[in-house]
Amino acid sequence: MTQKLDTLQAAIERVIGDRIVHLVRDRGELTLTVKATDYAAIGKTLRDHPDLGFEQLIDICGVDYSGYKDGGYEGLRYAAVSHLLSVQHNWRLRLKVFAPDDDFPLVASLTPIWSGANWFEREAFDMYGIVFDGHTDLRRILTDYGFIGHPMRKDFPVTGHVEMRYDPEQKRVIYQPVSIEPREITPRIIREDNYGGLH
């Protein structure tokens, strides 16, 4: 495994070169971080270069780093993380890109390179609000079309903004503001010598 990772790391360093922001090797996996401006071009290189040959995209997910390291993280907030597979070389790579603008997270779409990125990018858009430039059908995939916000963002309230219910007078489903009141629950601790027959 180590020799295979050495070979892959050397190939990435040789082919991608100075466009690498970070190349981290941890727990038997490589993570390549690139600039948003180079993201699509590097994706195409990773797929087409014979020494790399990542012909399959397995997954794309969004990440919100706003609370990372207990708030000690000071980098960009949103990232798109792609997981790539090379069947011909039998190796994997994690490709990470940070959106340069936290207020409007925008990165290039990988759908022209790997068509399987379509629904994964839609999910990252729906859950995190990351916009994939060049995606031909970027719309919500898991939440309602009228949903407000992006539920996997760390600043999204756990209760949400609105709730859905059936209104018998209107004979249809309606949205209304959330009626749940925030409360603090303090757990009750029972300290008995013979609790649960453990002694």
From Swiss-Prot:
Superkingdom per UniProt: Bacteria
GO cellular component, as recorded: plasma membrane
Translocase recorded as keyword: yes
Enzyme Commission number, as recorded: 7.1.1.-
Oligomeric form and interacting partners: NDH-1 is composed of 14 different subunits. Subunits NuoB, C, D, E, F, and G constitute the peripheral sector of the complex.
Family statement drawn from the similarity comment of this UniProt entry: Belongs to the complex I 30 kDa subunit family.
Protein name: NADH-quinone oxidoreductase subunit C
